[in-house]
Every structure is written in structure tokens, then in C-alpha cells.
Amino acid sequence: MRDRREPEKLEQRIRIERDGTVTALSGKIDFGQGLRTAFAQIVADELDVPIERVHVVLGDTDQVPFDFGTFGSHSVAQEAPLLRKAAAFARRQLLDRASAKLGLTEDKLDTAAGAVVAGGKRVPYVELLDSEPLAGTVPDDVSLMPDQRRKYTGRSMPHLEARDIVTGRATFVADIRLPGMARGAMVRPPARGAKLRSLDDTAAKAMPGVIAVVRDGDVVGVVAEREDQARAAAAAVDADWHAIPVEGPTAEVPMRSDANVDEKLRAASVRLTQTYVLPPIASAPIGPSAAVADVRGYGATMYVGTHRPFGVRDQIAKTLGLPEKKVRVLPQITSGTYGRNSAADAAIEAAILSKGSGRPVLLQWTREEEFAWSPSRPEAVLEIAAGLNVDGGIVAWRYDEHTNVHTAAGLDPQVLGVTSGRNAIPPYAEFPARVTLHIEPTRLRTANFRSLAAAENVFAIESFMDELAGVSAQDPLAFRLRHITDKRFRRVVEHVAERSGWGERPGGRRGRGIACTVYHGTYVAQVAEVEVSLSGAVRLVKVWCVVDPGETVNPEGVRNQIEGGIQQSASWALKEELLHRDGRVMNTGWDTYPIATFRDAPESIEVFVEGDESAAPTGVGEPGAVPTAAAIANAVFAASGARLRSVPLTRERVRKAMPG
């Protein structure tokens, strides 16, 4: 375990192993974004070794440096410079050792394929380790490998673990098997926050295969030899609960407060006010939550799917009353969740069951449990007012975002602003604006979600930009461009228009819509083409996307992430809505919570990666999902005249909104 206050140490980042392979270490987690591959590309280039020799360890809390978690599309931006410098520093030390060993000045030395070379001599890195591993504080000014010598960075590569995943060799949490491992099942209360009044476990304890009925406060579960036995016994536990309504917190955060906004709105030549509504939606991972806990007297080992291995470690240590250093978290491959795995629900429950039974325990949630008990994306009501001058330019903007908390990190205004208020401030050229975030109470459990609040805010802002263009008789593209001064932002918007043939309107019942944004330094613009039937059914036909993530480590990896984000966001826009009553989720299965399937996929998604290579790399795990819903809604209006200010864009809603 590495202390979170330590400076960057080489031994925390890079190891040259005795077999000549290289181990690179990071606290980040790869749940489909391609981080493992990108990090391997960076390290292979800076150390001058074949990429197949680079092994990347992610999230093992006994090995990697402390990390707060993998979220917000920060990973490449944060880790790439650190790994690059560490690998370059390792190469520097190897050259120093070779110079002393060979008696040659360093200007006579070079590296190639995992060895120091000089004339006809070749010294493999492993022969330079002696008894001293590479170590030391990584300097900020270490010399990096020249761009022209990089073999991997900037080139498309398949994910290193892709073959294992598609052939079934990859290890997911449910694949873990430990000696003496039992299975667990939880006894669920009727509602979140309920308190346990009494418990009768007599019948459950007498059932076949039952090892223990475990209670820790208001947490109750059964441990048995087989999962079916554990579930049957859990159903036989007679628990009396006292339901206590739980509501989320409230807060108000001024995010931008320019002077005289209301006065300028009143004086505007054209004024427009609209409200946009987005429902809560489920994380709905293909693989429900699972964890294996092995709790012994001397400590605990956890096998989990998580975005926050150190956060899980800290929570497990607190739950079990152990020092942090006595808990090891070993992250496993997990289904893509983008936020859901920030919570350690299954891990905490498995740890309690393991401690209470004295056995390693595998706990797997059911699909119904996943829908009913996992956190969701909050609902949002977005109120926007803007004024235009006689030339059709924006002169004032007022934006009120009403939503719930998007994180469990507390109510610090700065935290709320970058989570629940993400992308609430429009990315266009500055005009007088007042932007206020209102955190409203809810009985629904809410937390991190892919793009946090950005997808909600951008849906409202980009739909409203189209409506402003409409009331001022301007083309939606031209209207946006007149309000963009950032050169990189302008370029992606212009290029997506060119790539999609924006000026060539599709015929029949088809229409195109545009939406764009800047997400944490990544510039993204999309055009969607849809077909709307007379009955209001929406079919997504094509999507064009131009993205600028700065320096691009793996272009194919970027395309994969953007395509996946578009597909998922299209599902949010067209299909998904979590129904709840007094905090209880009502639709807890695929039959009542539909998501987009293969038949709903568009004919094509064209992603053009046009990164500014002179700029630092930024994230791509979330930006692709941000503008899609607005692009689709704007396309639906272009195709049918139906302006939808809420999602999902169901057949019934679209038909009702169609003119005539």
C-alpha cells in the first residue's frame, strides 16, 4: 500500500522484472475504456521495450500508488504524464548504470528493444538491475523520448485483454474460486433506510446447506454452501422492519453570477423561456454487482469490480474495524458501469458475511436487486431563459438547474459544481449569464453516473440553442458558430457539419440535428439523423461525431469509447426511464426497463478523431455520451416538427407533440 501523500516515486510506477518484462503500476481501473492498453503504449515507448513485454497492474491496493478513483474522464489526463515521466526516468537510470558498467560516456549509448546498446554491444535491462531495483523521486524535467522514436503512442491498437474477454479466459468477480468458499444472499428491507426491529432466523438456520445467518446492525444475510440454498434461507428469515423515509440533501450553488442579467433579459429584442425535464435512469450494468470477501483474523482480501479500489479498502477497513493496511483490494474485470461501481455495496455485504461465517464468501446480486437497490442518475428540471438582440445574438442567459446529488462526496459547493453542476455553464462565447444549481431532496438513491450531470445539462442547453435559432430564423449550425470563439471548439463543429453534409437535408420523414459541447477539456460535436414514422416511432439512422481529445494515445481506443458513449446515450434518449414511488423502484427487470438492443443500433456511427496533438491528452470515456440526446431530439424536430423537451422520446410522446 502506498501513502496518499507521497510524491511520485519510480518504484511505485515502474518495475523491471527478472524475466525482462516491465510492470507498470496505476491506481486507475480499466472497465472497457482501454486504459491498460494506453498505459502500456506510453510505457513501451518511453522505456523502448516491445509492448508485449509490458504488464500493467491496475488498482491492486498492495502494489499501486494511491488514487482517488476512476471517474470524470480524468484517467489519461492524470496518469499519462506520470507514467511517461516515470518510464523515462527508469530509462535514464538504466543508461546511467550501463555507462558505469561499460565504461562509456552516455552520449555513446542508446536503447533498443529492452536493452542498452553501444556499437556492437547489447546489455539487456535485466542485467543492469544487480541487487538494486530502480528507485527514486521522479523529476518533473526528465527528458522524454522524442516523438519520432515512439512506436506505439498515437497508433491504433486492440485492447490487450480483448482476446481473453471474448474467449472467456478473462476473470470476472463471479469466476473467483477460493478454498472453502461459500455463497451469500441478503435479506432486504422494504425500503432504503429501514431499521430492523426484530429477527427470527430459526427456520433459516435449519435449512440444508446453511452455514450462518449473519446480522450486523441493520444488515442481515445468509451464508450457505450453494447460492440456491443461501437464497432459499434468506427468504425464510422472518425480519420485522421499521421503514423510515430517507430524503437526500438540499443546497443551492451559484455557479455564475454576472451583473444585470434580468435587466438585459427584459431589454432584449427577443426573449425565450423553456423548461426541460429528464427522468432518473438506472446504471443497469449487464453484470449485476458481485464481490468475494476473504476475511481472516489478520486481515481481509477483497475481489471486486470497482472504480475506487482505495475507497473500497477504506470502507471495508471501517466496516470490519481493521487498519487500512490490513485490507487488500484486488479489482477484477467488470462490466462497464461508469459510476455504479463507485459504491461498494456488494463488497461491504460480502465482508460482513465472511467475517460472520468465518468462510470466504461470494455474494452476487440478482438483476432485481441491482435495479431496486443500486444508485441511479438523478432526475433534472432545467429552466432556461435567454434574450437576443436585433441581430440574433445572445445578450443574456439565465439557467436554473434543479437536480439531486450526483455524488456521495458531500455538499461542498466546489464538489457539487463539478458533479451535479457539470456542464451547466454553456461553452459559448461569454455573454451575461446567471447559472444556479439547486440540489433538491429525493427519496431515490442517487450517485455518480456516466458524465455526471453533463448529459442532462447539455440536453437542455443544446435543445435550447436550436430553439433560439428557430425563433430568430437562423440555421442551428450558423447560430452556434456565431457564438463560438474557441478555435478547437469551432473546428470540431465545422468539421462535423462537413463530414455529415449538413447542408444536404435528407428527404422523406428524416431529419438531422446537431449538438456540441466541451467536456472536461475534450471537444465533441455530433450530428444525428433520424427517421420518424407517422405514429411517432423514432429510428436513429446515422450519427457523425468529431472529437478532439488533445494528444491521442490510441485512436481506435478513442473511437471505441465515443461509439459506445453514443450507443448508450441513444438508449437513454429513446428508451430509458426509472419509475419510482416514495423512493422504491417500480421497474426492476429488463421487461419493464427496456434498453436499446442490436436492432435499435444506427446503421452507422462515424467517429473522426481529430486531436490537437500539441495539447495535453484529455479523457474520452464520457464525452461521447454527452451531446447525443440533444442531437437526436433536434433531429426529431427537423424530421417531424415535434419539439420534445423531455426524454425518453417514446412513440407516444413524439406523436402527441407532432403538429396537426
Language-model segments: what does each one mean?
Residues 1-660:
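Cofactor-binding beta-sheet edge motifs in enzyme active sites
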